[in-house]
């Protein structure tokens, strides 16, 4: 089996916590389908003390989501912050600058910056 795919999640609201829960619950099936384990190795959110109902003990915590996206140990950055300005585009820019794969469902960000970010991803 290949080395684990290390995921960083920026934004731990309802969707972010749900993604972590789903990845944990479906870990065996995902590992078989992907040919390697998929682990959440880093997270970032505004409030570290908030109880999100998921176990984050195995993940490194980052106060700065863009710094997390630049971490050389991370393979994929999942942006779940939302909004088209501020932190969300900075996280994606940092991830792309460090040749990371990026996952987002942020329609506002993609509508405003999608063309530029797609070009950046192709560099």
Where in this protein do the model-derived segments appear?
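N-terminal glycine-/serine-/threonine-rich beta1-alpha1-beta2 phosphate-ribose binding loop
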Residues: 1-97
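Hydrophobic residues within beta-strands of alpha/beta enzymes
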Residues: 77, 102-103
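Rossmann-fold NAD(P)-binding glycine/threonine-rich loop
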Residues: 83-98, 105-123
């Amino acid at each position: 089996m290949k080395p684990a795919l290390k995921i960083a999640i920026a934004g731990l609201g309802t969707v972010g916590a749900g993604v972590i829960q789903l990845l944990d619950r479906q870990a065996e099936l995902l590992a078989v389908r992907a040919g390697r384990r998929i682990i959440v190795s880093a997270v970032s959110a505004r409030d570290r003390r908030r109880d999100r109902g998921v176990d984050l003990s195995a993940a490194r915590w980052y106060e700065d989501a863009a710094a997390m996206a630049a971490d050389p140990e991370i393979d994929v950055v999942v942006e779940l912050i939302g909004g088209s300005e501020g932190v969300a585009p900075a996280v994606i820019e940092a991830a792309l600058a460090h040749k990371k794969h990026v996952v987002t469902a942020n329609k506002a960000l993609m509508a405003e910056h999608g063309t530029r970010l797609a070009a950046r991803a192709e560099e």
